[in-house]
């Protein structure tokens, strides 16, 4: 004979896995060609000189050098470049 009333199930209690987005290499850091600089959704950061952009908007180094963050243009867009 049960001495506790049966508990109803809940429909909550789930969450998606984190996607590990964000800046992976910061300003002034040395990078090798192919290194991922930023993982992002959309273009929060734009590709500058010697930086490529993947189909998921990931920015990566096209050449070896140092990472440089800069704000340019009338809309104050953030660009990431690689200086040799």
UniProtKB/Swiss-Prot annotation:
Molecular-function GO term, any one: structural constituent of ribosome
Keywords: Ribonucleoprotein, Ribosomal protein
GO terms of biological process kind: translation
Region feature (Disordered): 1-22
GO cellular component, one term: cytosolic large ribosomal subunit
Family affiliation: Belongs to the bacterial ribosomal protein bL27 family.
Name of the protein described by the UniProt record: Large ribosomal subunit protein bL27
Organism: Shewanella oneidensis (strain ATCC 700550 / JCM 31522 / CIP 106686 / LMG 19005 / NCIMB 14063 / MR-1)
Gene giving rise to this polypeptide: rpmA
